[in-house]
């Protein structure tokens, strides 16, 4: 059993995981950029879970190394999180990366070269509310690869009541999630929540875009059938009409967007395989401009 657990990035996903750990009797060290006395998760239909802090804001305030470090910052914040990794990690630390995309290990391993880095796919609908607490709709489920480090992390979260699958075909699982994440770009450019996918014209465009992404996923080794296109579009069309996405929230708050790891990656990987990406060629520059300007 892990005796030292640190959570870097107590946002929506991070708060969800921290709350599960706290409920199971663990006391995760909370690390972020905003000082708070604690964090709170409110799952629909359940009692709130308050995780006592403080949320530390300086690596100098904490002692390391820890057994498990859960990195739940946005990928755009990885460089800013490096001092935490330096302070809290060594060769015995398992670093679980709870981020979108398919490049978690490549992006994080340079910041903690001696640690085992475990990419984790998170399936949950968690959203930070204006008052600061996090709303969770339904259950949270994670997928990690196989292997000793991944299984150690999976065992920790299973002990906390989470559903965690160790998938030997993690490549396929990661690309399946990316097909869903990529559609969030439509929400950012339209400024609308999930109800927008109930428009027939948007659904048709979504199918074409997911099919474009699917070709890239297969070239990268993902074993996904043609049926996944309709499956993904049905998923977003059946979501609660008011459901948002972290990238839409970032756009509203004028924060940098995860456009490259959700959408730009499709273009980058496609170029390596000589694949055309006509929809991405329009979508990605607009997302990049929305994120990084100028203007």
UniProtKB/Swiss-Prot annotation:
The active site is at 177 (proton donor). It is found in: Cytoplasm. It is an enzyme of class 1 (oxidoreductase). GO terms for molecular function: 2-dehydropantoate 2-reductase activity; NADP binding. Its main location: cytoplasm. The keyword Cytoplasm applies. NADP(+) binds at residues 10-13, 33-34, 74, 84, 100, 126, 255-258. Gene3D superfamilies: N-(1-d-carboxylethyl)-l-norvaline Dehydrogenase, domain 2, NAD(P)-binding Rossmann-like Domain. One of its GO terms (cellular component) is cytosol. Pfam families: ApbA, ApbA_C. Its EC number is 1.1.1.169. Substrate binds at residues 100, 181, 246. GO terms for biological process: pantothenate biosynthetic process. It catalyses: (R)-pantoate + NADP(+) = 2-dehydropantoate + NADPH + H(+). Pathway: Cofactor biosynthesis; (R)-pantothenate biosynthesis; (R)-pantoate from 3-methyl-2-oxobutanoate: step 2/2. Keywords: Cytoplasm, NADP, Oxidoreductase, Pantothenate biosynthesis. It comes from the Bacteria. InterPro entries: 6-PGluconate_DH-like_C_sf (IPR008927), 6PGD_dom2 (IPR013328), ApbA (IPR003710), Ketopantoate_reductase (IPR050838), KPA_reductase (IPR013752), KPR_N (IPR013332), NAD(P)-bd_dom_sf (IPR036291). NCBIfam families: apbA_panE, PRK06522.2-2, PRK12921.1-1. Belongs to the ketopantoate reductase family. Catalyzes the NADPH-dependent reduction of ketopantoate into pantoic acid. Was identified as a high-confidence drug target. This is 2-dehydropantoate 2-reductase.
């Amino acid at each position: 059993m892990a005796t030292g657990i640190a959570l870097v990035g107590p946002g929506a996903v991070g708060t969800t995981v921290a709350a599960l750990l706290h409920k199971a009797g663990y006391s995760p060290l909370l690390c972020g950029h905003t000082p708070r006395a604690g964090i709170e998760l409110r799952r629909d239909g359940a009692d709130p879970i308050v995780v006592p802090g403080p949320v530390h804001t300086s690596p100098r305030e904490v002692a390391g190394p820890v057994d498990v470090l859960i990195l739940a910052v946005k990928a755009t914040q990885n460089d800013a999180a490096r001092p935490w990794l330096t302070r809290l990690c060594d060769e015995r630390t398992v670093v679980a990366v709870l981020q979108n995309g398919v490049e978690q290990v490549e992006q994080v391993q340079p910041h903690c070269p001696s640690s085992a880095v475990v990419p984790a796919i998170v399936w949950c609908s968690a959203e930070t509310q204006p008052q600061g607490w996090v709303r969770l709709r339904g259950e949270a489920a994670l997928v990690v690869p196989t292997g000793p480090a991944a299984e150690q992390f999976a065992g920790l979260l299973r002990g906390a009541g989470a559903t965690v699958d160790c998938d030997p075909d993690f490549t396929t699982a990661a690309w399946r999630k990316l097909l869903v994440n990529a559609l969030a770009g439509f929400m950012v450019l339209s400024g609308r929540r999930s109800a927008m996918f109930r428009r027939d014209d948007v659904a048709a465009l979504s199918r074409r875009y997911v099919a474009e992404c699917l070709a890239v996923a297969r070239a990268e080794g993902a074993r996904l059938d043609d049926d996944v296109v309709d499956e993904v579009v049905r998923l977003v069309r059946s979501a609660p009409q008011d459901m948002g996405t972290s990238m839409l929230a970032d756009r509203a708050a004028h924060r940098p967007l995860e456009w490259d790891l959700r959408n730009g990656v499709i273009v980058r990987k496609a170029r390596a395989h000589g694949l055309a990406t006509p929809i991405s060629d329009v979508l990605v520059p607009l997302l990049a401009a929305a994120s990084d300007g100028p203007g």
